[in-house]
A protein has these predicted regions:
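A charged N-terminal "starter" segment
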Residues: 1-146, 150-152
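Active-site loop/helix belt of alpha/beta enzymes
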Residues: 1-3, 8, 160-204
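Residue-level recognition of the N-termini of beta-strands and the immediately preceding loop/turn
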Residues: 62, 152-154, 199-203
């Protein structure tokens, strides 16, 4: 019997003879091939189709970046490197994973509050863009750059003074843990310029 899962959130994997089929291979055979259960299985064709569908709905000058925290599995990240225009990471571990791909460092960005001094130094050495979220991070990046003989690449993650009412996620509108409050941005940009950091402006 052939069937397709009707679960509203399930990927369209077929079911053949009561066995889920992923990438044309029955799940039972995949388990034998992996050698253990549980395990994760992904269909490269479906991933490619989803990315292509998203691109078709967006203007051609929009760049797609994959948030690695959504799925940091190395095999998935390696595959995504050939489909998207860049990576966004949120930890030193994620950065290490993406640096093992063919993605150019300038297309990798590091965002998230509470970055450690070691992670910031790692970022400068790798030549990626760091989305700074505090004056502390700017200072640590400048120190790392001076020590390594490199110019840190930075952007500023701005916490705007307004809130999107239709969004379920509230990452703007008054003080938040994410980003620099809008009223503090001019002073921070002045400091970035004074320290000689390589600033880039982006819209995400």
């Amino acid at each position: 019997m052939n069937a397709t899962s009707q679960h509203p959130f399930a990927l369209p994997y077929p079911i053949v003879e009561n066995r889920l089929v992923v990438g044309g291979i029955p799940i039972t055979r995949l388990a034998e091939r992996v050698g253990q259960t549980p395990f994760y299985a992904y269909d490269r064709r479906l991933i490619s189709e989803r990315v292509a569908l998203l691109r078709s709905a967006l203007p051609s000058d929009i760049h797609l970046h994959f948030a690695v925290k959504s799925n940091p599995m190395p095999a998935v990240v390696q595959f995504m490197a050939g489909l998207v225009d860049g990576f966004d990471v949120a930890s030193g571990g994620e950065l290490k994973t993406v640096l093992d791909t063919a993605m150019p460092p300038e297309q990798i960005s590091f965002a998230g509050p509470g970055k450690s001094g070691r992670e910031l130094r790692q970022s400068v050495a790798a030549g990626i863009v760091v989305n700074v979220e505090s004056e502390r991070e700017v200072t640590l990046l400048a120190e790392a750059g001076a020590s390594l003989g490199l110019i840190p690449k930075v952007a500023v993650r701005v916490n705007p003074d307004f809130e999107l009412k239709s969004s379920g996620m509230k990452m703007g509108g008054g003080p938040k843990q994410f980003g620099v409050d809008a009223e503090q941005v001019p002073d921070l940009l002045t400091r970035i310029k004074a320290l000689g950091l390589d600033f880039t402006a982006k819209c995400r």
